[in-house]
Amino acid sequence: MSASVRTYLEIMRYENCLMAGFAAIIGTLIAFNILTSNAPSSYSPGEFPLFSSVLIFLAVFLVAGAGNAINDYFDVRIDSINRPDRPIPSGRMKLKEALYFSYTLFALGTLLAFSINPICGVIALFNSLVLIFYAKTLKGTPLLGNLSIGYLTGSSFLFGASVFGLEGLKALFVLFLLAALAITAREIVKDIEDMEGDKMEGADTLPLRVGAKKASYLAALIGFLAVIFSPLPYHLSMLGLRYLYLVLLADLGFLAAIYQLLARNNPTKSSKMFKIAMFFALIAFIAGV
């Protein structure tokens, strides 16, 4: 007996897929605004690509859902202990069914992306491979797993910007970089926060490998790089003064997160501060055009 529609949506973690899709739309909007305001004479984005935006949303939604489904496929043993209510360990979905479902979503999402333009398609294909490799291997690899999450999260914005080809990627590269750095730093902080539980489960994370102190220094360094690079869009004349003012709030949040991590030894509060800072950084990009 095949799984229900509700079970398929559950294994996709459709709420996360919606967030990833909307992040791509935000990337399209920001890239469009930047290119419209600062477009070189040889390039103009024209009218806002509404139809392509719908396609990019669907492509990101499907690829993200595929990544979540295949993650459950490889995590079936762990989930049978920690999350027995998940679709596979609960018996509501067969193991092979989850695998075939994820491959179908990967294929549909990638085909949709290629229908927009080759750059969108290449990003979809590459991200699909990263998601498969992450679920199978990278998730249990110290630092590389954190970097993978940072890249994949930040690439949602690049995905949306790729509607405009290479010019779109150039316009959104700094936002991608800031998001990737901030997410990577926060992922390391979360691993520090979860050290006791991860140790009991036999997980191999960066803090368990090198110690909480060294991992904290690395997370702080990566977060500080996000602060250093944050004024770049203003200095490159991509975004205006509003961006600079608003991103300063984000920078204060990043610095507060670093302070909580290093001076107060409070990874839980640091993780929350990183999340708040990323929200202000996103607002700065939206409002800064």
Curated annotation (Swiss-Prot):
It comes from Methanosarcina barkeri (strain Fusaro / DSM 804). InterPro entries: DGGGP_synth (IPR023547), Prenyltransferase_related (IPR050475), UbiA_prenyltransferase (IPR000537), UbiA_sf (IPR044878). Belongs to the UbiA prenyltransferase family. DGGGP synthase subfamily. It is found in: Cell membrane. Disulfide bonds: none annotated. The keyword Lipid biosynthesis applies. Its EC number is 2.5.1.42. It is an enzyme of class 2 (transferase). This is Digeranylgeranylglyceryl phosphate synthase. The chain crosses the membrane at residues 17-37, 50-70, 106-126, 141-161, 163-183, 221-241, 243-263, 269-289. It is a multi-pass membrane protein. It comes from the Archaea. GO terms for biological process: glycerophospholipid biosynthetic process. It holds the Pfam family UbiA. Pathway: Membrane lipid metabolism; glycerophospholipid metabolism. Keywords: Cell membrane, Lipid biosynthesis, Lipid metabolism, Magnesium, Membrane, Phospholipid biosynthesis, Phospholipid metabolism, Transferase, Transmembrane, Transmembrane helix.
